[in-house]
């Protein structure tokens, strides 16, 4: 019998695992090669057999494994009649001990990556202006304030592209994470542990479809705050899901075990129960390092285009 290498990556799926091996990826690639390419995007942290085994036998941490599914794809002229299935990351499988107790969707799995200090160096997209904020004139030079407010309040699917807008999605900013680092600190308050998570990121703006004037000193801090809020929302959403499932996939218990061994001996027997009410404070700081070659887009207002 051949022994499995402990460095091999593992995945879970919501259906039968055999379906993944029977997929026919495009360009004639082997399923295992296409699956490896999907995992290498690292949107969800990769886990090897060794890492899962260590989590299973360690105190204060539960394992998680990237979740992969199959999606249909459009048939092309280069591959007529080819099977229309391709691999896609759908999130992460959450374990409590050795039992799979739930799945985190992809959006929350991005927050999981931050909470285990493995933030993906990938492009994300946020809507501008942030929800609940107004659209000042300097924020959208191509849209008058009344038009921007009407766009924001319109029901989904009702927006129509305006002249010069083409097929692009309005009001979107896409940053690329260049560097990211997360620090964890614990302290004791009233005899109970509190975990503080400090996330720091340096971003590059790769697309500015909202037409923001990034040379304006008043605009860039608002954008950085919006990016930080987006990351924090994902982290808090993932934390809420993990608490509901009673699975400490972040290793907060192991952190307390290292920093406060005496307190850990009191909590270890019912750690999963205590984890659901563990106070966790999340702090996120984002700095935009580069804003791209076009800092002040040459965009006409829509009423000018109509004339």
Region spans (language model):
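A glycine-rich, acidic short-motif signal
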Residues: 1-307
